[in-house]
């Protein structure tokens, strides 16, 4: 993400980046951002700054604990990443990356002192996704292929679904996707041992929590 032009990283006055927005979109919706969508979600689900900060701290605490317990030891490869000069261009040197860069030991007092992303908003850097780099890979194959190769799968994909969500809120998709998957398979949240929900912004997870009523000890543990 650090090398992708974004609203927060493109210097003012530079040439426009990205692709033109379809005219049909302009006629029906406003051009908005995930920051604004997250704030709308917080307002619609009546989420306070204090609630978001508490979740932000919990998220950091859990991430740090996972690394300290070496949960990812067998899954992470160390890489040599290129250094960037002060002007943002690639340097001739590299640095070693062996763990997530965004972990921060924090407390509620420190989080409460952060400036909000938007005026009158409730999200801060402590409750928003970070701009850092990462990569992941998963090897998928059919059961028949796994049997042929004699490999034991770590997990089985039972079902998936595609849902639509309000393009202005845009981050509410996990709510409807979870509801549909549970309904399609005759399950409830009590049947799920561990849940992973993308923490794009704290309000995304907390709105999902209000709708699904899960045991939050099982969510992104």
Question: What do the predicted segments below correspond to?
Answer:
Residues 1-41:
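Flexible glycine-/small-residue-enriched beta->alpha junction loops
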Residues 15-23, 116-124, 156-163, 217-221:
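Glycine/charged-rich beta-loop-alpha catalytic/anionic-binding loops adjacent to active sites
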Residues 144-156, 187-189:
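Phosphate-handling active-site elements
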Residues 51-148, 211-218:
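N-terminal extracellular/periplasmic Venus flytrap/periplasmic-binding protein-like
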Residues 39, 75-82, 158-221:
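Active-site pocket-lining segment
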Residues 25-33, 46, 50-56, 120-137, ...:
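Active-site pocket-shaping loop/turn-to-helix segments
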């Amino acid at each position: 993400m650090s090398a992708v032009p974004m609203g927060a990283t493109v210097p003012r006055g530079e040439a426009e980046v990205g692709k033109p927005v379809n005219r049909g979109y302009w006629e029906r919706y406003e051009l908005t951002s995930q920051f604004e969508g997250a704030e709308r979600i917080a307002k619609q689900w009546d989420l306070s700054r204090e609630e978001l900060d508490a979740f932000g701290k919990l998220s950091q605490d859990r991430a740090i604990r996972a690394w300290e317990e070496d949960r990812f030891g067998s899954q992470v490869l160390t890489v040599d990443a290129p250094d960037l000069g002060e002007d943002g261009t690639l340097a001739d040197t590299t640095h070693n990356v062996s763990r997530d860069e965004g972990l921060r030991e924090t407390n509620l007092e420190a989080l409460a002192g952060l400036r909000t992303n938007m005026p009158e908003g409730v999200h801060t850097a402590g409750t928003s996704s970070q701009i850092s780099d990462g990569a992941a890979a998963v090897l998928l194959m059919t059961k028949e292929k796994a049997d042929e190769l004699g490999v034991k799968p770590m997990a089985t994909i039972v079902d998936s679904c595609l849902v639509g969500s309000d393009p202005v809120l845009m981050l509410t998709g996990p709510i409807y996707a979870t509801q549909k998957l549970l309904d399609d398979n005759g399950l409830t949240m009590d049947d799920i041992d561990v849940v992973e929900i993308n923490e794009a912004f704290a309000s995304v997870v907390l709105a999902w929590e209000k709708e699904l009523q899960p045991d939050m000890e099982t969510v992104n543990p």
